[in-house]
Amino acid sequence: MLKRSKFETTQSQIMHRAEDLISAASNRYRITVQVANRAKRRRYEEFESAEDAMMKPVLRAIIEMSDELTQPEIIGEI
């Protein structure tokens, strides 16, 4: 029996996004550290706001960073 994900993104989509991030980066170590730092920051933000996180911080960081890579208008200038 397969366990269904609560999210619209599947494991294969997340792996594809992670591969895109690594291939676009000039330094694999640096992008890995950036993903880890963003996940750590998001984890503490969610902990302080007492929200019930449905998605693990690392997965959320990979999705956010890959979206920023593929859709630069998300970042935009304020």
Swiss-Prot record:
Please list which residues make up the signal peptide: none
Q: Which GO terms describe its molecular function?
A: DNA binding; DNA-directed RNA polymerase activity
List the GO terms this entry assigns under cellular component, sorted alphabetically. Answer: DNA-directed RNA polymerase complex
EC no. given is 2.7.7.6
Q: Name one GO biological process term.
A: DNA-templated transcription
The record lists the catalysed reaction(s) as: RNA(n) + a ribonucleoside 5'-triphosphate = RNA(n+1) + diphosphate
- Keyword terms: DNA-directed RNA polymerase, Nucleotidyltransferase, Transcription, Transferase
| Record bears the keyword Transcription | yes
User: What InterPro entries does this protein map onto?
Assistant: DNA-dir_RNA_pol_omega (IPR003716), Pol_omega/Rpo6/RPB6 (IPR006110), RPB6/omega-like_sf (IPR036161)
Q: What the protein does?
A: Promotes RNA polymerase assembly. Latches the N- and C-terminal regions of the beta' subunit thereby facilitating its interaction with the beta and alpha subunits.
Q: Which HAMAP family match?
A: RNApol_bact_RpoZ
Question: Which family is it part of?
Answer: Belongs to the RNA polymerase subunit omega family.
How is the quaternary structure described?
In cyanobacteria the RNAP catalytic core is composed of 2 alpha, 1 beta, 1 beta', 1 gamma and 1 omega subunit. When a sigma factor is associated with the core the holoenzyme is formed, which can initiate transcription.
What is the name listed in the Swiss-Prot or TrEMBL entry for this protein? DNA-directed RNA polymerase subunit omega
Q: Which organism is it from?
A: Nostoc sp. (strain PCC 7120 / SAG 25.82 / UTEX 2576)
Q: What is the lineage of its organism?
A: Bacteria, Bacillati, Cyanobacteriota, Cyanophyceae, Nostocales
